[in-house]
A protein has these predicted regions:
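A conserved catalytic-core segment of Leloir-type glycosyltransferases
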Residues: 34-99
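Membrane-proximal helix-turn-helix segments that form the acceptor-binding/catalytic region
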Residues: 146-163
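Active-site proximal beta-strand in glycosyltransferases
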Residues: 111-114, 124-142
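A short, active-site helix/loop in glycosyltransferases that binds the activated sugar's phosphate group
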Residues: 161-187
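N-terminal subdomain of nucleotide-sugar transferases
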Residues: 1-56, 205-206
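C-terminal amphipathic helix plus adjacent low-complexity
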Residues: 196-220
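Short N-terminal targeting/anchoring amphipathic segment
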Residues: 89, 100-118
Length: 220
């Protein structure tokens, strides 16, 4: 099985969560690649299977967003994206879209697994590949502050073939405030799995991605 892991946090530092998950997935026989914001403006050398989204040049237009990119954490990026101007957000989306598309073309993943519900979840859906999203409560809080972001994140989550919530409170919020019963019939609703993210989540990621792929194939 081929998986593309997308994180809203820095992806090119060896001790990051996405790196640990990728390594553990490969031990399970999965061909795993990774995509996410880069900690530097350009990678010093190409790392096979790693697709860094270089946002530093775009972020230079906003001190707040530049600090978030330099910070490298998912929450910093998501919070900054909810506050930047529509024009800058458009530039960020286009930059990220190109790299996500490149990662998909290069690795031909069976499923995309996205850490956090945000702009990259939306772009993953656009590729047409089955998508699983891992949602934390903070993702929903941040997206809820911006009308455009809430609209995009809501549509993205509803379009996913698999949904994982960090905890029961997040799952409840998703069901009550983000996933409308009118969108799908009961038979089409995607069940929400609950488990917290960790660098050792490889087996859980593989299981939920296998279910998502089966669900997509069944509906096809």
């Amino acid at each position: 099985m081929r998986l593309l892991l997308i994180d809203h946090g820095c992806c090119d530092v060896p001790d990051t969560r996405v790196h640990h998950c990728r390594e553990h997935l490969e031990k399970l026989g999965v061909q795993a690649s990774a995509c996410g914001p880069s900690s530097i403006s350009h990678l010093a050398s190409h790392q096979p299977g790693l697709h860094g989204i270089h946002l530093h040049d775009v972020a230079a237009a906003s001190k707040l967003f530049l600090r978030a990119v330099q910070d490298g954490t998912p929450i910093a990026l998501l919070e900054a994206l909810a506050t930047i101007s529509p024009s800058l957000l458009g530039l960020v989306r286009e930059t990220a879209r190109q790299m996500v598309a490149e990662a998909v073309d290069a690795n031909l993943p069976d499923v995309i697994f996205v850490f956090h519900a945000g702009i990259l979840t939306d772009l993953a859906i656009e590729t047409g590949v089955p998508v699983v999203v891992h949602v934390s409560f903070s993702d929903l809080v941040v997206a809820g502050r911006n009308g455009f972001m809430r609209q995009r994140v809501t549509a993205a989550i509803a379009s996913c073939n698999g949904i994982v919530a960090t905890d029961a409170d997040t799952a409840q919020a998703l069901r009550q405030e983000w996933l409308s019963d009118d969108v799908h019939s009961p038979d089409e609703q995607v069940p929400i799995v609950i488990w917290p993210p960790s660098p050792n989540s490889a087996a859980d990621i593989l299981a939920v991605c296998q279910c998502a792929l089966s669900r997509r194939q069944y509906r096809a």
